Amino acid sequence: MRTRIKEFRAKFNMTQEELAKRVGVRRETIVFLEKGKYNPSLKLAYKIARVFNAKIEDIFIFDEEELWEKR
């Protein structure tokens, strides 16, 4: 899953640390989210979207092909 977290942080002039504190996670979690190495829980995705006054789907871009991809 791709994210636009970094883009939204820049728009709001917010550091990874500030966002992490606002949503109750460690900065490393934000790093992993931005790199696409971690998929957030629905609750975390919602919290992040609320910080930026946006919809979840504005921040998290889900590739539907990933859903059907065999692992």
Swiss-Prot record:
<feature type="DNA-binding region" description="H-T-H motif">
    <location>
        <begin position="16"/>
        <end position="35"/>
    </location>
</feature>
<dbReference type="InterPro" id="IPR001387">
    <property type="entry name" value="Cro/C1-type_HTH"/>
</dbReference>
<protein>
    <recommendedName>
        <fullName>Uncharacterized HTH-type transcriptional regulator AF_1627</fullName>
    </recommendedName>
</protein>
<keyword id="KW-0238">DNA-binding</keyword>
<dbReference type="GO" id="GO:0003677">
    <property type="term" value="F:DNA binding"/>
</dbReference>
<keyword id="KW-0805">Transcription regulation</keyword>
<keyword id="KW-0804">Transcription</keyword>
<dbReference type="Pfam" id="PF01381">
    <property type="entry name" value="HTH_3"/>
</dbReference>
<dbReference type="InterPro" id="IPR010982">
    <property type="entry name" value="Lambda_DNA-bd_dom_sf"/>
</dbReference>
<feature type="domain" description="HTH cro/C1-type">
    <location>
        <begin position="5"/>
        <end position="59"/>
    </location>
</feature>
